[in-house]
Amino acid sequence: LYQLIRGLLKHLMPVAGSSKADPARWRQEGRRPRVNLLGPSLLGFRCRDDIREVRLLLEELGIDTHVVAPLGATPADLLRIPEADANVCLYPEVAESSCRWLERQFGMAMVTSVPIGIAATQRFRHELQQVLQLDAIPEVADASRMPWYSRSVDSTYLTGKRVFIFADATHAIA
């Protein structure tokens, strides 16, 4: 992904010393904020499901999904990446180097929280709020009861058992 993005966007890089992109420019332009979802791939574990859920979450917050890459992205899509207000690094093992390069070269803000799990989803929402300078966003309804439910579902079944976790790095760590 990094090589594709860098190769395609090299000729669009801002002149050295120019001002960085403002992640809140969407306000001046009178539109909704938009983000790129970077990292999902065809070989990823449940990537299509993750994209669907993250898009729903973004929609709830009033944020548009601009480009999803590399999954399904064309060279024309990759050329549109700098039009977004920020990049969401959904799979750091695939997209972190691209997001860091876009941050350095285009001044694009990067959201690093991966919304897998209740606490991580809350961090993701708050990071989006800070990066895009959104108005206050409501907390997830009944969030205080969710961790208890999450802990209790498999706790008796898995207690004392050995398990093997098979997934990409993002899902395994989550």
Regions found by a protein language model. Name each.
Residues L1-A174:
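An N-terminal assembly and electron-transfer interface module characteristic of large anaerobic redox
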